[in-house]
């Protein structure tokens, strides 16, 4: 026997005191055997996915599952934007993605009152293809009505197809910068929602609210800083818009929408 072998044997004997030590089971073996983990081991375990149930959100007509927002689907089985549908207790819900909707980003940032209620009349300026508008359609229900305005024929065509299925939406091909064009076609609204990428977006919002927003109604303005001035810091532009709105309305909420919506904020006012 070589000296190295003898030295190794002596070391093993000193470590075990002459007895064979049992092997410590790994985490998987302990889990199979029903054993408990130490505090240190538990801290290294992957977090288990929790099963959340759908709960009413503190914002009217919205629901929450974990940190995700949902509306009750007005047309069960239909997902016009390939959104996730969740069925629970005989109801179907649509997932409202904050990366696609500034309304969702606003609520997840802590806004507690959007002013949107079941049965409301909503004037949506800059409706585009109708993603957020379709969720507002869920929120206001069949008793409500949403006027969707956009000047682009291509996106308005998509919105027309959406409105054919959702009877509480009315498409209008018009420029929100010229509200006089649709004065005779739009009634007073409970809510004015604007999402327009124009330099004078604050002025457009004020003009439309003065014409169409009823006394005590709510206005929601999505401010796109880079559409106003690319040379100024977004926060400076947000403050400028806030000052303009405060001269006319009561500002009840203001949220910067980072990181879901870059260089955007949302302002909620009451007339």
Where are these regions (language model features)?
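C-terminal substrate-binding/active-site "lid" region of AdoMet-derived donor-dependent transferases
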Residues: 2-4, 10, 155-158, 203-271
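N-terminal auxiliary segments of SAM/dcSAM-dependent transferases
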Residues: 2-94
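Conserved alpha-helix/loop element of class I SAM-dependent methyltransferases that forms part
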Residues: 57, 76, 80-81, 97-121
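Residue-level signature of catalytic and energy-coupling elements of molecular machines
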Residues: 107, 126, 192, 269
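Helix-to-beta-strand junctions that scaffold the AdoMet/dcAdoMet cofactor pocket
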Residues: 117, 140-141, 212-216
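Conserved class I S-adenosyl-L-methionine
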Residues: 117-128, 143-147
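Conserved SAM-binding loop of SAM-dependent methyltransferases across substrates and taxa
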Residues: 129-142
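S-adenosyl-L-methionine
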Residues: 147-201
């Amino acid at each position: 026997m070589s000296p190295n072998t003898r030295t190794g044997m002596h070391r093993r004997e000193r470590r075990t005191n002459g007895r064979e030590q049992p092997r410590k089971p790994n985490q998987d073996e302990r889990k199979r055997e029903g054993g408990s983990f130490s505090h240190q081991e538990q801290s290294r375990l992957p977090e288990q996915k929790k099963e959340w149930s759908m709960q009413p959100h503190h914002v009217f007509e919205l629901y929450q599952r974990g940190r995700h927002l949902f509306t009750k689907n007005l047309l069960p089985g239909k997902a016009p934007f390939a959104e996730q549908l969740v069925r629970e207790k005989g109801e179907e819900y649509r997932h409202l993605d904050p990366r696609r909707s500034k309304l969702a980003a606003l609520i997840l940032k802590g806004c507690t009152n959007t002013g949107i209620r079941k049965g409301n009349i909503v004037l949506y300026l800059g409706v585009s293809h109708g993603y957020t508008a379709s969720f507002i359609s869920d929120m206001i229900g069949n008793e409500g009505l949403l006027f969707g305005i956009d000047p682009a024929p291509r996106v308005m065509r998509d919105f027309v197809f959406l409105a054919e299925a959702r009877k509480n939406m009315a498409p209008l091909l018009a420029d929100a910068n010229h509200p006089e064009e649709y004065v005779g076609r739009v009634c007073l609204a409970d809510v004015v929602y604007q999402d327009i990428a124009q330099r004078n977006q604050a002025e457009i919002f004020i003009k439309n609210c003065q014409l169409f927003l009823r006394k005590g109604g709510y206005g929601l303005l999505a401010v796109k800083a880079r559409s106003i001035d690319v040379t100024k810091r977004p926060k400076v532009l947000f403050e400028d818009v806030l000052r303009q709105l405060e001269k006319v309305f009561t500002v009840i909420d203001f949220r910067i929408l980072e990181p879901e919506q870059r260089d955007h904020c949302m302002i909620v006012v009451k007339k």
